[in-house]
Amino acid sequence: FKEGKCMNKIFKVIWSKSKQCYVVVSEMAKNKTGKKKIVVASILAALAMQTAGVIDVAAAAGDQPSRALADGRVTNGKTNGLAIGNFASSESHQSIAIGYYSVANAAEIDPALPATAVGAGAHATGQSTVALGLLAQATSGKATALGSKSVASEDAAVAVGSDAKATGGYASALGADATASNNDATAFGHGTVAAGASSTALGSRAKAGAVAGVGIGMLANVTNQYGVAIGGESSSTADNSIAIGRKSSATGENGIAIGTFTTSKGTNGVAVGTNGTTAELGGVAVG
């Protein structure tokens, strides 16, 4: 072979009847199907040149002006952002707005903390905010709203689900119509409400309405601070009271009711049992 030509004559591509596909073989192999030959070395060389070209472009590109498509709008002087959709608006560096009347505005100089809004009417208007869904609203730093009409309106609040609302700092509302309306509150389940600071409501329509209250179970209800209600339709309605079991009820301060249909009515009362066991003021009832 002559120097410079050997690489172009070592391999070729032929049709393999047994494998029913093209295969790479030695130049010396016979091709029974025809005369067409593809030079592998040339293809590899072309790919190498193309890849090198892409790398050079990426390295040279740097920051680019924000882009608008389909009548979207971008704020002058902002870079690397994107607005797609009629009246979509990207108003800060690297922020992304996709959807009719969506708005993404990180309201921060730091381009590493962009906002992202996706969905008709979605608004993400704080640093590192994310709003995803029809009319989803994430309006404070690091807030996340996912779901139709979901709202996360305080720092680091998280709302996930249709009409879910997290309106306290670091609050979490997960589930359709779930509401966490105080700092560090957690509501998990359809229609749950955690209204007290650091309160927890878990289960369909469970409620925790005071500081550090815990309501777990369908329709569990806690109205006073540090109260605990666990079980379907259980109820804690005094400070520090505990009700555990279906339809159990603790209505006196520091009272404890454990068991189905048990009731602790008075301060410091303890009722343990089933089917209507009741403890009065300071008393203990077991049965």
Please identify what each model-predicted range represents.
Residues 1-6:
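Short, Lys/Arg-enriched N-terminal segments with co-localized hydrophobic residues
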Residues 10, 15-19, 23-30, 37-47, ...:
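Glycine- and small/polar-enriched repetitive beta-structure motifs of secreted/surface proteins
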